[in-house]
Regions:
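Domain-level signature for soluble enzymes in the chorismate/prephenate branch of the shikimate pathway
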Residues: 1-359
């Protein structure tokens, strides 16, 4: 059973007219105010989701903006806006979305392939990465015992990451669009005999009582998130990420009490050490040995390939595109692109950014 998902409505960008200069001035003033308040960053799910943890860990004083799903994150970043804020909010309707944060791989469940497809579809770039520890608990409305639970809700990925624990009892497992969304569902329904698999922070946000903690199969389970942005916005987004790293290191804690011990310092230290990562996507020519020659060209440049992922091509049946992560700075990535040119029919460099120490 899948909980119903809300759909976002995109707000059209205003066109240019005779008063465009005045609007541009007003927009610049809003952008200046936005910079002081921190960037608006879209994430999938509800407050308390692991994606929100990633936003809070990666940025300095961000304003997380929840949207229903991964596609909506990409649409919000591409359009630069989301639906009007809730009544009483001080958020400006036309205040831009600076970036989005999406999961790309987990130590237990592997690659989130949908987000590779969406990244290619929406022509965004990768401005950074952040690795978030995944600690799961089982939580329910206050006053219930674990013996009384009959139904357990969560995102399918979280259910898989807690499979060993969940198999110890004859519970009915029900999927929701998000871990924090499972908590919201239980609270809104006032549902007894039901529990959610989610983070301890999400349980606290929704007023749930933890029945079992640390239920993830892998004790040091982690999820790697990508920070995505429009190409013209990426430099500003990266500057916020670097400031977040320095701030976290100086204060010894992350924004809103989210630990960034494995995130903030890594951005600062890895960038200072010159350890950079480049994400690219390519399609090889339909000739014998093309992929082999591409991999050989990368090896001859002395570049470490930390990830190679294939996805079906959207243009031709039974052909594939390859997603590659290289430990390479911008100059090394450009050299790799030149070396790959003769054996590829398509190649896009999607971003070069400081590599997380845990990524």
């Amino acid at each position: 059973m899948t909980a119903s998902r809300r759909r976002a409505t995109r707000q059209a960008s205003p066109g240019r007219g005779p008063r465009s200069a005045e609007r541009d001035s007003q927009s610049a003033e809003r952008d200046s105010q936005s910079a002081d308040r921190g960037p608006r960053v879209a994430f999938s799910g509800e407050p308390g989701a692991f994606a929100e943890d990633a936003v809070l860990a990666a940025f300095e004083q961000p304003r997380p903006v929840p949207v229903p799903g991964f596609r909506e994150v990409f649409e919000a970043v591409t359009a630069g806006c989301v639906p009007a804020p809730a009544p009483g909010s001080d958020e400006a309707v036309d205040e831009p979305i600076a970036a989005g944060v999406v999961p790309i791989e987990n130590l237990v469940n592997g690659t989130v392939r949908e987000n590779y497809d969406l990244l290619l579809e929406h022509h965004l770039v990768v401005a950074g990465e952040v690795v978030v520890p995944v600690r799961l608990c089982l939580a329910a409305l206050p006053g219930q015992s674990i013996e009384a639970i009959e139904r357990v809700y969560s995102h399918i990925q979280a259910l898989g990451q807690a499979e060993s624990f969940l198999r110890t009892r004859p519970w009915t497992l029900l999927t929701t669009y998000n871990t924090a969304g499972a908590a919201k569902l239980i609270v809104e329904r006032g549902e007894l005999r039901a529990a959610a698999v989610l983070s301890p922070r999400a349980a606290a946000l929704f007023g749930l009582e933890i029945l079992a903690d640390g239920i993830q199969q892998v004790a040091d389970n982690r999820t790697r998130f990508l920070v995505v942005a429009r190409p013209e916005s990426a430099p500003g987004v990266r500057s916020h990420l670097r400031r977040a790293a320095a701030s976290a290191a100086a204060s010894g804690s992350g924004a809103r009490s989210v630990s960034v011990a494995s995130v903030g310092p890594s951005l600062r230290e890895q960038a200072a050490a010159g350890v950079m990562r480049t994400t690219m996507v390519l399609a090889v020519r339909n000739e014998p040995g093309s992929l082999h020659r591409c991999l050989g060209a990368i090896a001859r440049l002395g570049l470490n390939m930390s990830k190679l992922e294939s996805r079906p091509s959207r243009d031709r049946a039974w052909e594939y595109v390859f997603w590659i992560d290289l430990d390479a700075d911008e100059a090394e990535a450009a050299a790799a692109a030149r070396a790959l040119a003769t054996d590829t029919s398509m190649l896009r460099i999607l971003g070069t950014y400081p590599r997380s120490a845990d990524g």
